[in-house]
Curated annotation (Swiss-Prot):
Superkingdom of source: Bacteria
Similarity annotation: Belongs to the UPF0246 family.
Protein name in UniProt: UPF0246 protein YaaA
InterPro entries linked to this entry: YaaA (IPR005583)
Gene: yaaA
Any one cellular-component term (Gene Ontology): cytosol
GO biological process: response to hydroperoxide
Protein source organism: Escherichia coli O6:H1 (strain CFT073 / ATCC 700928 / UPEC)
Coiled-coil blocks: none
């Protein structure tokens, strides 16, 4: 099974590292091409393109400028320990054992606007470049055109390496759109997380993102290899609802705390 998750805007390059092991991203030649395009942007252009404040635009212009292709533990950090958004709050990779990191390295992939596909221990220099951003480049008008089949091909390599054909899609729609399902050599399973609000179950973004991290952790900690094992997920009050689920979609619900 190959788990797909989105990256995070919030980054952490300060906390103590829980592993010193690392690998290097496999698509850095592509990343360098995007950095070349991003360096052409002024901070005001970055602010407009990314819809972020002038202060954040300045920070990210500096990140693009400082980015260099030689990744070391001194200028980069393992991706799974660098991302710090809601998904990663649920994942809690900072508490992983070395065996957990081993399993995650084989079975978890982070989709990325700049790096394409990241393995958990791949070193990553700080950046902000969301997949949905319309950054014109030599291959087209946006990042979806830039990456084309590259991300899908890399995922197929990972699936072949583990002798498996199941993808657990825990990524957001914005990021999964960079994958070509018809060219992916896999059955795609999408867990959906619904929280009760005023008597009705619906997707609440913050909770759903955290739940994607919780599910990823559940798979990694328990070394799950078959999609039917996911139905045992019960972290933080979620339960599997078979009646609402279908072949490709596993629905998990949680009652409102009263």
């Amino acid at each position: 099974m190959l788990i797909l998750i989105s990256p995070a805007k919030t980054l952490d390059y300060q906390s103590p590292l829980t592993t010193t092991r690392y690998t290097l991203p496999e698509l850095l030649d592509n990343s360098q091409q995007l950095i070349h395009e991003a360096r052409k942007l002024t901070p005001p252009q970055i602010s407009s393109l990314m819809r972020i404040s002038d202060k954040l635009a300045g920070i990210n212009a500096a990140r693009f400028h400082d980015w260099q292709p030689d990744f070391t533990p001194e200028n980069a950090r393992q991706a799974i320990l660098a991302f710090k958004g809601d998904v990663y709050t649920g994942l809690q990779a900072e508490t992983f054992s070395e065996d957990d990191f081993d399993f995650a390295q084989q079975h978890l992939r982070m989709l990325s606007g700049l790096y394409g596909v990241l393995r958990p221990l791949d070193l990553m220099q700080p950046y902000r470049l969301e997949m949905g951003i319309r950054l014109e480049n030599a291959r087209g008008k946006d990042l979806y055109q830039f990456w084309g089949d590259i991300i899908t091909n890399k995922l197929n390599e990972a699936l072949a390496a583990q002798g498996d054909n199941v993808v657990i899609n825990l990524a957001s729609d914005e990021y999964f759109k960079s994958v070509k399902p018809k060219k992916l050599n896999a059955e795609i399973i999408k867990p959906v997380f619904l929280d009760e609000k005023n008597g009705k179950f619906k997707i609440i973004s913050f909770y759903a993102k955290k739940a994607r991290g919780l599910m990823s952790r559940f798979i990694i900690e328990n070394r799950l290899t078959k999609p039917e094992q996911l139905t045992g997920f019960n972290s933080e009050g979620y339960f599997f609802d078979e009646a609402s689920s279908s072949n490709g979609e596993l629905v998990f619900k949680r009652y409102e705390q009263r």
